[in-house]
Amino acid sequence: KPNILWITVEDISPTLSMYGDSTAITPNLDKLASESLIYTESFTTVGVCSPSRSSLITGMYPVSIGTHQMRTGKDVFGWGSREYDGISNAIDVNGDSIPLHSVVTPPSVKCFTEYLRASGYYCTNNSKTDYQFAAPVTAWDENGNDAHWSNREANQPFFSVFNFDVTHESKMWLHRDKPLTVDPKKVPLPPYFPDTETVRNDVARNYSNIELLDQMVGKLILELKADNLFNNTYIFFF
């Protein structure tokens, strides 16, 4: 059985050289793209974070399973230190209590990794489970910042997810004190943005974060090659 590696990223749009925008220097992604099938006409089922992720993990439309409203789970970021009543004796894959207002999907709705695990795959998630519903403990063999295919049994096929959030919109401010690697004077600006120093710096930060992302992808591919797994692994980048 082949191995499967998902590399998921956030908030970059098609701002990559394989889609015609070479502002960010991304040698690792360029190399991967040159050896890959590139999708140029793809669509999302819903255009916001968690509802979209619920569709990816279940293979179902969010409106069909009640996960289309952002947000309906626990306060994952602790904004306002909200208090809520939990469902009695119910915890999610992270060991957290499940709030009463969480989406409860129909019993027939499964995380597709449950089927992969039943087929012998070692499934790891590093590390988001922000699905709008509580991920069941049966979804992953490993879940968290240390989850990795290297912990599987010898010769066991794996399905591994690495969610790199370095390009998440919030990181434009988190990394605001770090040096820019892309010149603000050279970034393309959409016509609906004012051409100001602040806007150019923000856009340059986004492109600089894409260059950081490229390094992370390169490191992951090197790990595959070091483990002699690269030639038997399907890699999805989206």
Model feature map: region roles:
Residues 1-5, 35-40, 118-124, 155-159, ...:
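Loop/turn elements at helix/coil->beta-strand transitions in domains of secreted/extracellular proteins
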Residues 6, 27-30, 110, 114, ...:
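Solvent-exposed, polar/charged alpha-helical surfaces in well-ordered, non-transmembrane soluble domains
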Residues 8-9, 126, 237-238:
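Generic enzyme active-site microenvironment
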Residues 14-24, 47, 70-72, 78, ...:
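Active-site-proximal cap/lid insertion segments
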Residues 6-8, 13-107, 121:
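Active-site segment of extracytoplasmic enzymes that catalyze sulfate/phosphate-ester chemistry
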Residues 109-135:
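Short, charged N-terminal beta->alpha structural module
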